[in-house]
Amino acid sequence: AETPTAMAIGEGGTLYTACGDSREAAGVTVTAYDATLAAVGTKTVAERVLSLHTEKNRVLILTENTLLLGDAALTEVSDREESGIQQMAPWQNGYYCVTEEGLTHRRL
């Protein structure tokens, strides 16, 4: 099995991992696992995944170029179209992030 480049755990024990290399055609696969480690959903992205975070029943996927927001099983993933985020930390239906402008707070 591939070594994950990012991991996060959400409510109810859902585990998220990012595996793969964005330089390869297959890209990076983010997988959601239930508490028994059975895969319950996947999302493939073409960019390097910088970090994974959970907030309530959602997962935030920070890539080199954007922020993706998905449901717990990764069946619905949308692009927040926010670039320039270097680091982030979710908190109470929003998140703090570090950008070129400094530390900011944004709502989900």
Question: What is each stretch, according to the model?
Answer:
Residues 1, 37-44, 74-81:
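A short beta-strand motif characteristic of beta-propeller blades
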Residues 24-31, 66-71, 102-108:
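Structural motif
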Residues 1-12, 44-57, 82-94:
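Repeated scaffold domains used in trafficking and secretory/extracellular systems
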Residues 77, 81-108:
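Blade-level signature of beta-propeller repeat domains, shared across WD40, Kelch, NHL, RCC1
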Residues 11, 26, 55-56, 63-65, ...:
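Short loop/turn segments that connect beta-strands within the blades of beta-propeller domains
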Residues 16-18, 61, 97:
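Residue position within the beta-strands of beta-propeller blades
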Residues 13-48:
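C-terminal structural cap/anchor segments
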